[in-house]
Amino acid sequence: MLFGSISHWKRQLAEGAATPAELVERLAAAMEKENPALNAYLSWNTEAALQQAAQADLTKPLGGIPIAVKDNICIAGSPTRCASRMLENFVSPYDATAIARLRAAGAIPFGRTNMDEFAMGSAGENSAFGPTRNPADTERVPGGSSSGSAAAVAGGIAIAALGSDTGGSIRQPASHCGIVGMKPTYGRVSRYGLVAFASSLDQIGPLTQNVEDAALVLNAICGHDAKDSTSSTQPAEDFTAQLGHDIKGARIGLPKEYLSLGNDAAVAAAVDRAVKTLTGLGAEVEEISLPHAEAVVASYYIIACAEASSNLSRFDGVRYGHRTGIPGGLDELYSRTRAEGFGDEVKRRVILGTYVLSSGFYDAYYARAQRVRALVARDFADAFGKVDFILGPTVPTPAPKLFDADLTPLQTYLADIYTIPANLAGLPGISVPCMQEGCLPTGVQLLAPHFKETALLSVAHALEQALR
């Protein structure tokens, strides 16, 4: 049971049916009751949220609305642990720009959501503080790495949440949990205050109960930021402006490669249902090709792990974070601190990243992966010369069982095969629920050219409304 959308609570607050403090208290009570079964939240501070609620300005776009926040986005005075022992006792001294903008819009950051450690994972199983569970079936994964954000929204213990998306970490758990998840164009949302995994791929975005709420959150957090050198100077927009518009004549491409990679029958049925629905709304759906689709996973993991190897080198026991208590020299300090502080998946990716950047292997792996990335971007440029949007599965299968012993690491990595391309090319993408009643949640993904979020949200909203 969902807690109620942003739009719903804005009306309730405006009409005096509830106060911001009452909303925080009701949400906190739901969190206390439901979180033990889901492990969606790592912590929350009800007292601090109530203090903010007492000063809420209901005339602001998100006035009095609590928003959950992934544990890798800095909130001043709040633990920012990245679900890792390495940062278990770290308290952020400042707000991320996205948080500052939420506050400026009147929202109340409330609750730190669980995640795969340092955003490395596709299942929500890699947290140092225990796995997150899927509200649809607590024996299954919620997806990752924004596992807690997705589970909190789907489980009725968050109105909306922020996550981060490096290779699908917003859209993939949104699909598995049956909610909306959106990755904006790279640079749309400032990365200042987001703990880096792979800097050329990371992007903050919303996980929400519906498309309208995603647009409302984007309105608050988007815009240029001088503190982020990769921040776009593209003017901010009203992302709700085209919601409810007719999409007749919209040209939508369906990549043939996305239909030939062994999708689960439920996923194939969801895509077919979306195609029929969009066609019924007057959109024109045609087959297209993305020739390098099968190379994206290898390219992504080489690039992302290389960047992670560099970004995570700062966690060495000297400046901040975990520091080993075992005496020894400087080399021992580094190695023991990192061995104790990082989990297995993080170690695996740091080792891989160091390897592909090392002498003799840079050209063989990293440089080739970057060339594939350029080819993927060119594939999309060619496709968007023919169509306005691209439709496909968000993930190849519904949510697997937690700690499924039959799944190999490679199969786990392949779960992101449809979401990774948007990160490599820097495109906006959104996952919209499209499941049959009685079945596990699954979603379909819509992609658009750079900075076409407003049009993308319009099509996603039309699809969402028609599917209801």
Sequence positions of predicted segments:
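An N-terminal boundary/leader segment
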Residues: 1-45, 280-282, 355, 468
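Serine-dependent amide/ester hydrolase catalytic core
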Residues: 10-14, 247, 258-260, 292-293, ...
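Structural helix-boundary/capping segments
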Residues: 14, 33, 155-160, 166-261, ...
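Short alpha-helical scaffolding segments that buttress acidic/His motifs in well-ordered protein cores
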Residues: 23-27, 299-300, 346-354
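Conserved acidic residues
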Residues: 39, 159, 388-390
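Long amphipathic alpha-helix in the N-terminal Rossmann-like dinucleotide-binding domain
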Residues: 47-54, 106-107, 116
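Conserved hydrophobic/aromatic pocket- or pore-lining residues that grip, position, or stack substrates
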Residues: 49, 70, 102, 130, ...
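Short glycine/serine-rich loop/turn segments
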Residues: 62-204, 257, 305-306, 392-410
